[in-house]
A protein has these predicted regions:
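N-terminal core-binding DNA-recognition domain of tyrosine site-specific recombinases/integrases
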Residues: 1-18, 23, 41, 195-201, ...
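Basic, Lys/Arg- and aromatic-enriched nucleic-acid-binding interface segment
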Residues: 3, 7, 22, 26-28, ...
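C-terminal catalytic core of tyrosine-transesterase DNA break-rejoin enzymes
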Residues: 4, 22, 69, 73, ...
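Conserved hydrophobic/aromatic pocket- or pore-lining residues that grip, position, or stack substrates
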Residues: 13-16, 24, 34, 55, ...
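Catalytic-site neighborhood detector that most strongly recognizes the C-terminal catalytic loop/helix
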Residues: 38, 46, 97, 107-111, ...
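C-terminal secondary-structure termini that scaffold catalytic or DNA-interacting sites
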Residues: 91-100, 107-148, 160, 192, ...
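Active-site/catalytic core of tyrosine-dependent DNA strand-transfer enzymes
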Residues: 128-141, 147-215
Length: 290
């Protein structure tokens, strides 16, 4: 059993015993003073921006390509990508020309158990999508984000805004052709008949590209990590701006969890120090004779 598993079990027990103390079923929470091993944080492997560009160039799947662009430029979770709707953005010609095109993240698609939906009494659930199979114990729902900080406006590069415009035109042609057969939920990431694209579909198509190009075997969520890392580099470490895009409640989450320092940058730092400090020609006269 791993340290992380022990820690997860301890969290559950501590929560259960805490509730038992509140209900006067026991006097003290025995899990509070328990000694648990420190779980070693394993840094997730991520794609570099160059690797993502390779994947985009090799990708011939329209929906996956859009998902790549959104996850990277808007720092979205996969549920947020799938829950994006056309009314939650401004990709007008005026907005694009003024560099103020944006997407607004205020919904996400998630698969939950039918029992959970009943127990929640549809709290935070905007709509329940029809099941494809009769005996499914789970349903996909469009729901509000878990935290208020997850609701955010993210400005979009012109190229991505143009991709969205092209996708919207394609979708409108499908809607016109299918008529009432199209179930219009106003989703950006929609199937031919209007239902939300499945996260497993995106993961499968992404895995195909990984296998084809021999890229590091990462999960879709890692694109969010790539996004944060790249934005930190571009902005010169503007943590608050990047936090605004990522929707993290605390800024330290950006630096602690996503602040990947790439080997390429570390090598560049060594080169910069060599040229700026150890190159005798660059030293001031007093230091040259030391």
């Amino acid at each position: 059993i791993t340290e992380s598993t022990v820690n997860e079990i301890h969290k559950v027990l501590r929560s259960c015993f805490r509730q038992a103390v509140k209900w006067d079923m026991m006097e003290k929470n025995p899990a509070v003073d328990a000694t648990v091993p420190k779980a070693k944080k394993q840094e997730r492997e991520i794609w570099t921006a160059e690797m993502l560009m390779q994947a985009l160039e090799a990708c011939d799947n329209k929906m996956l390509k859009i998902a790549f662009h959104l996850a990277f430029t808007a720092t979205l979770r996969i549920g947020e990508v799938l829950g994006l709707t056309w009314d939650a953005m401004d990709i007008s010609e005026e907005a694009i020309a003024a560099n103020r095109a944006y997407v607004y993240i205020n919904k996400e698609v998630e698969r939950v158990s039918k029992q959970a939906v009943e127990e929640l009494n549809s709290k935070d659930i905007i709509l329940i999508f029809p099941s494809q199979k009769k005996n499914n114990k789970t349903v996909r729902v469009l729901k509000s984000p878990k935290t208020d900080s997850s609701k955010r406006k993210v400005f979009t590069p012109k190229s991505v805004a143009q991709c969205l415009i092209e996708l919207k035109k394609d979708q409108e042609e499908i809607i016109e052709a299918l008529g009432n057969e199209y179930q219009n939920y106003n989703l950006v990431m929609a199937t031919t008949f209007g239902l939300p694209i499945g996260d497993s579909y995106l993961r499968t198509k992404m895995q195909d590209i990984i296998d084809e190009l021999g890229l590091p075997d990462v999960v879709f969520h890692s694109l969010r990590h790539t996004s944060v890392t790249y934005k930190l580099k571009l902005s010169g470490g503007d943590i608050k701006a990047v936090q605004g895009d990522s929707g993290h409640a605390q800024a330290d989450m950006v630096t602690e969890v996503y602040g990947h320092i790439l080997d390429e940058d570390r090598r560049k730092n060594a080169e910069l120090m060599e040229n700026a400090f150890y190159n005798k020609e660059n030293l001031n006269p007093q230091m040259k004779n030391q």
